[in-house]
């Protein structure tokens, strides 16, 4: 069984991730984990926090001499900004700082203090902050190394920011390559316009959202299942993506566009090559049919809402005085769609890893790879 948990607050001492179920014998590249962490921090439109933090991962358990041992892997990301928050985020003692009482529309603030019976919104916003995704990216970086050992790769690209759309015609998803630009967009002209839109929004004290795609390449046929709802791969991927802060919608393949066309134009026809292997000319399904991977690239698209912390605050309420006020301001980003695409890669990697381990086992990498090879040989053709 594969699972992971995260812990920690945005301005606490550290964030941690516990990853359980990675097979023994997987070689771990710490530099690659930290490269993924750096990708999450970059991006045009990010806030001042990124100039403070330089996220590095410490592996505290589960790895010895560069190889997993089969027991839980503990990952730690230290918050450098903690030294500026030791009084406000002290584990023990008496609060001396003014409480945060002006809720932000679109955030967890108001609902959280009601649900958990808190008087200070900071008790909610610290954990609900997207800073938590640093721990997810760390966990996802471990999962990616497992998937790469199985021949599976994951990439992403941004296709829309604030209504500025990239040209997505004729994309070769099977060979889509990683993009290291500061907006992770493969359309240079659109990216320049996205940058202008972000700059204008920042000057106006506003924020922007957008859309990105995560692509899983070289996925084996038949991972997932049609037999029970919770075994369906598309359910697991959609849930993983929707769990990311600020994500409001997810599509797989053509997604909601299926509503606009007849079935004859959308279902991916199958053909035989000369060697009797099956191929398709289209991939409207996005690599999943009947809750199972079908061998085509898996395409998951997600929409991120504009960040709800605005430098020109919206109208709101004060939970203590019961007066109408402007929402509180926290240091935040203008746009974090590029960062969300990296988090999306991590969450898809974690979900795919769970599905792969469910099918091929989790004791040791030798067994996993042998099981995968035997299975691929059986289903040829």
Which role does the model predict for each range below?
Residues 1-381:
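Generic N-terminal targeting/processing segments that precede catalytic cores or assembly contacts
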